[in-house]
């Protein structure tokens, strides 16, 4: 068939099969897709490589529809996080509770008093929406919020220590994900790094000896994403605050994960809390909103009213501020902390972190037979004890007792790697991608975070199709 037998774009646009596509995707998108499709087919058609049926209006409309569906498919995809890492940075960290989701919906749909004082009828400050609540929960004098904790650290350093020295222990010069390094952030903030002590041991006398007329602040960083054990020494917040205040210097403490409550109450490892840092004398404390706090991505800066005011006057503050959706979600999450007795029931991240191993194992035993039937006799599916992680740099050596579906190919060890990669890829290609981890010649699906069991089971039928490709 020659290219002259290709239908014209106008003819395709008028074809009944294309009308639903035009309604759904718009005329311009359909037109561009049809032109691209016809351009690709013109040469094969000229050479007679295509049958008449392949060039029919119905077939071409179908191919255009497939392309348009792919083009318009959202890149933001829901996934099943069965990796065993609860606050997974690459998978969005904390899952928000229903109260926060409802607050976001209202804030997105309607105008709100973001920077408007309803009492006076004048312009307001967006921090006012959550300041009183955070002060109540932390005991801080004042509060400001930016878009993440890295921004909080940058803003605080630049506001309090620009063109001066920042004194910090060598053992706290951490790097977290995305090449965020404390020395680099200090340099960007205009603060000259003055490191003291050694990697494993730093003493109060090291800070004392480092203070000089060029000193701008003392900084303490909670090393939440790694642990130095053995012959170690560090200076507690209270002692460091005493040293700083004796020389009229502020103490900035970066808590990173930012817990507001003692997590050991729910059987989790204890993390230093914001309240403890402030009570021990830290003038400014920074922490994340989407890690242990269980809220949206945000960086919270709390502490001295005078220093917070100085931070808020920094022109960088506007560049780093949060939007209405973040503030709405953050307020809703923080409100849950007013009732700590019910927090594990209502705060999604805490509920998942504290989920009992026995409950997870029961769920795994319920699902295992179905998954085994889908995979067939060439695979072994076993319910196995597992050890998960909190994630997002919190308590790196702590493990969460859990249970997993351990998928192992029934073949010689030298052949297992390829088979495991195939099933891992097939799970990622499901309508709701399933993400696990490969370890010890098996694919592990840790079920700690499997909330929607019906949706997981419903799509297992597609797994056979993906494996057959």
UniProtKB/Swiss-Prot annotation:
EC number(s) per entry: 2.9.1.1
Keyword Cytoplasm belongs to the record: yes
Molecular function per GO: L-seryl-tRNA(Sec) selenium transferase activity
InterPro entries: PyrdxlP-dep_Trfase, PyrdxlP-dep_Trfase_major, SelA-like, SelA_trans, SelA_trans_N_dom
Swiss-Prot/TrEMBL catalytic activity: L-seryl-tRNA(Sec) + selenophosphate + H(+) = L-selenocysteinyl-tRNA(Sec) + phosphate
Cofactor(s) needed for function: pyridoxal 5'-phosphate
Keyword Thylakoid: no
Modified residues (N6-(pyridoxal phosphate)lysine): 291
One Gene Ontology cellular component: cytoplasm
Enzyme class: transferase
Annotated localization: Cytoplasm
The entry's keywords: Cytoplasm, Protein biosynthesis, Pyridoxal phosphate, Selenium, Transferase
GO biological process terms on file: conversion of seryl-tRNAsec to selenocys-tRNAsec; selenocysteine incorporation
Pathway(s) annotated for this protein in UniProt: Aminoacyl-tRNA biosynthesis; selenocysteinyl-tRNA(Sec) biosynthesis; selenocysteinyl-tRNA(Sec) from L-seryl-tRNA(Sec) (bacterial route): step 1/1
Taxonomy, superkingdom: Bacteria
Function text: Converts seryl-tRNA(Sec) to selenocysteinyl-tRNA(Sec) required for selenoprotein biosynthesis.
Family to which this protein belongs: Belongs to the SelA family.
Protein name: L-seryl-tRNA(Sec) selenium transferase
Naturally occurring in which organism (per UniProt): Stutzerimonas stutzeri (strain A1501) (Pseudomonas stutzeri)
Gene for this chain: selA
